[in-house]
Swiss-Prot record:
InterPro entries assigned to the protein according to its UniProt record, in alphabetical order: Glutathione_peroxidase, GPX_AS, GPX_CS, Thioredoxin-like_sf
Family: Belongs to the glutathione peroxidase family.
Subunit-level organization: Homotetramer.
Species per Swiss-Prot/TrEMBL record: Sapajus apella
Gene Ontology molecular function, alphabetical: glutathione peroxidase activity; identical protein binding; selenium binding
Name the record gives this protein: Glutathione peroxidase 3
Broad class of enzyme this protein falls into: oxidoreductase
Signal sequence region: 1-24
PANTHER family xrefs: GLUTATHIONE PEROXIDASE (PTHR11592), GLUTATHIONE PEROXIDASE 3 (PTHR11592:SF32)
Length: 226
């Protein structure tokens, strides 16, 4: 009951416009293209244990944040902040989904079965357990990229004009809309259409403010979430 009351109070503040909004961040955030053909609900993925196929249509009516993750990256500490983001915004209908990938600096080298133990005991360590769903390791760029990532990337402009150092990037062919590094993020709205894309170094606090601002606009338009 207390949790519901807290969520209700926070939502009231959000709708009233009393929560701070994100400031302009150059290309740390890009709005996605209008008139996108199709939705994320046409796709799905296997959970990290490989035992369950999750169709993304189960997230109809939810806000969904897609994040490509890695266990041995300088940004792996974002896992802790992502847990906090999931806990804080879940009452407003947000679900985070994590997709391990080894294409950036070979920083996710282990098997699927090794990823959760690595997070728990190595980095971030200290018994860490993600409170959001992780899926099987796979490619987010290149010839074998997962199809839903093709959809996400084609729906949103890139956050940087540069791809990065080629000897640390492991895919072909390279394209302008490709993900630049681990922990890039895409927000999909309650209708399954991509809304925003964030640079991997954008702070989670700014990501949160951007999401809250979008939720407020949706509420003002009378858009219902699940």
């Amino acid at each position: 009951m207390a949790r519901l009351l807290q969520a209700s109070c926070l939502l009231s503040l959000l709708l009233a416009g009393f929560l701070p909004q994100s400031r302009g961040q150059d290309k740390s955030k890009m709005d996605c293209h209008g008139g996108v053909s199709g939705t994320i609900y046409e796709y799905g993925a296997l959970t990290i244990d490989g035992e369950e196929y999750t169709p993304f249509k189960q997230y109809i009516g939810k806000y969904v944040l897609f994040v490509n993750v890695a266990s041995y990256u300088g940004l792996t500490g974002q896992y802790i902040e992502l847990n906090a983001l999931q806990e804080e915004l879940a009452p407003f209908g947000l679900d985070l989904l994590g997709f391990p990938c080894n294409q950036f600096g070979k920083q996710e080298p282990g098997e699927n079965s090794e990823i959760l133990p690595s997070l728990k005991y190595v980095r971030p360590g200290g018994g860490f357990v993600p409170n959001f769903q992780l899926f099987e390791k796979g490619d987010v760029n290149g010839e074998k990229e997962q199809k839903f990532y093709t959809f996400l990337k084609n729906s949103c402009p890139p956050t940087s004009e540069l791809l990065g150092t080629s000897d640390r990037l492991f895919w072909e062919p390279m394209k302008v809309h490709d993900i630049r590094w681990n922990f890039e993020k895409f927000l999909v709205g309650p209708d399954g259409i991509p809304v925003m894309r964030w640079h991997h170094r954008t702070t989670i606090s700014n990501v949160k403010m951007d999401i809250l601002s979008y939720m407020r606009r949706q509420a003002a338009l009378g858009v219902k979430r699940k």
